Regions:
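Bacterial N-terminal signal peptides that target proteins for export
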Residues: 2-9
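C-terminal motif of bacterial Sec signal peptides marking the signal peptidase cleavage site
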Residues: 18-20
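Beta-rich carbohydrate-recognition and catalytic domains
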Residues: 22-31, 114-137, 149-216, 225-274, ...
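Pro/Thr/Ser/Gly-rich low-complexity, intrinsically disordered linker/stalk tracts
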Residues: 23-62, 94, 112-121
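Solvent-exposed loop/turn segments flanking beta-strands in beta-repeat/beta-sandwich domains
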Residues: 58-73
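Short beta-strand segments within Ig-like beta-sandwich modules, predominantly Fibronectin type-III
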Residues: 77-84
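Beta-strand-rich modules
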Residues: 89-111
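Beta-propeller and closely related beta-sheet repeat lectin domains
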Residues: 142-145, 208, 212-224, 280-283, ...
Length: 418
């Protein structure tokens, strides 16, 4: 069974997420009509998979009743009155040429047609610019997990983040970097959460007993809501070697926040004890009687990485104490009995990924972990534990030849599905 996915997907972009996503492109293209002079000047802009087309009639001698707008990909047909000067096309394919035709219609017959060739990038610039503004909230960061809250808000869990303003696509090199922040999204408005313990230079969450976040810190995993509690998996990281790639994983903590105030109630270490290559909490799914907690496993972590996915299940009441691990055929309380999930071997799953339910299927979304591949894939299953099938390349990040652009760990946000 194949799906056409239309939820928001946000890849992490370095060095500046806001700079990459906040400018809406407007283009002018020459029109072609049977070697004659064009009868209209056409411009367009795009957001996500929507194309806003506008035009100005340059030949007012033509007699017609209406405009007809079509394209050669989606097979949409729109008809608007002769006094209209714009229209909106949706579900337009991105990162490939699309021919859009503007026709003049008189008495049901087409009298003239102009063709405009467009290519859109598929980026949801409106949501991105709202989520990551140039000032007033988090202005850059990675991670970008999101969790819908019961009152309609969403909380975004960010990793390394900046709060300082961005001017003309640049930020001061002196800006303080937070190891994690939260963004509270409420009907198009955003606010940043940081400063744990009243220290404005502290991240939103800090491991208990830690005073120097340059040596030990939290990077976010995923989370879920149960009742009036928000559960967030935070991975405990430490600087184990010199250089920007010297970070190491230690374990994962579960942070419990009271809703709707987001007051931190308790911090508890996950019950899993095992290899530091197994990172539980990288995806989470609250589904019926069970909470499913997914782990990304580094088999090799180099230029040609190999990674696997494991899953444990528990109940909200036993989240901090008792887990069962999927063995490939059933569930066991022995963590060493866990087996990798079937069907994912063709794509190295990224360090952070998503599993969510969409209608009657489960969806796993990941970005290819190979360095700067730019490929985002989905797999579907009838069960939270797989087997995973229907591999789909749903998006390829454009401009990957730009060596200053580094993308990783794409995230899905199904609560914003159109």
């Amino acid at each position: 069974m194949k799906f056409r996915f239309r939820y928001a997907v946000l890849p992490c972009l370095l060095p500046a997420f806001a700079a990459a996503c906040s400018t809406e492109a407007t283009h002018r293209r020459p029109n072609i009509f049977d070697d004659e002079e064009s009868f209209a000047a056409v411009t367009f802009s795009s957001n996500a998979d929507s194309l806003f087309l506008s035009w100005e009639l340059t030949d007012d001698r033509i007699q017609f009743d209406s405009y007809r707008i079509t394209d050669n990909k989606s097979q949409q047909v729109l008809t608007v009155g002769r006094d209209e000067t714009s229209c909106l096309l949706t579900h337009v394919p991105y990162n490939e040429p699309v021919a859009v035709y503007l026709s003049l219609v008189a008495g049901g017959e087409v009298v003239k047609t102009a063709k405009t060739d467009v290519v859109i990038d598929g980026l949801d610039k409106t949501t991105a610019a709202t989520l990551i503004p140039d000032r007033g909230s988090v202005t850059g960061g990675d991670g970008t997990y999101s969790i819908p809250l019961p009152d309609g808000r969403s909380i975004f869990l960010m990793g390394d983040s900046y709060i300082g303003p961005v001017t003309n696509g640049q930020r001061p090199t002196s800006d303080h970097m937070f190891r994690n922040t939260y963004i509270l999204y409420d009907e198009g408005r955003v606010s940043a959460i940081y400063g744990a313990g009243g220290d404005r230079n502290a991240s939103a969450a800090v491991p208990p007993g830690v005073s120097d976040e340059s040596r030990k810190w939290y990077w976010p995993g995923h989370g879920f809501v149960e009742g009036n509690t928000l559960y967030v998996f935070q991975t405990v990281m430490y600087q184990g070697a010199e250089g920007m790639w010297g970070f190491r994983y230690e374990t994962t903590d579960i942070l419990e926040y009271e809703l709707p105030s987001l007051t931190l109630r308790r911090t508890t270490r996950i019950p899993f004890r095992g290899s530091e290559d197994i990172h539980y909490g990288m995806a989470a799914l609250n589904d019926g009687d069970y909470v499913y907690v997914y782990a990304q496993v580094d088999v090799t972590n180099d230029a040609d990485p190999i990674s696997e996915v494991l899953v444990a299940r528990t109940t909200p009441a036993k989240l901090c104490t008792d887990w069962e691990y999927y063995t490939g055929s059933g569930w066991s309380t022995d963590p060493s009995a866990a087996e990798r999930l079937e069907g994912l071997a063709s794509v190295p799953v990224s360090s952070q990924f998503n599993v969510f339910r969409l209608r009657d299927k489960y969806v796993l979304l990941t970005q290819n972990k190979r360095y700067n591949s730019g490929e985002i894939y989905t797999f579907t299953s009838d069960s939270p534990a797989g087997p995973w099938r229907n591999k789909q390349l749903i998006y390829r990040i454009p401009a990957m030849e730009n060596r200053k652009l580094f993308t990783y760990n794409a995230m899905a946000h199904p609560q914003f599905e159109k």
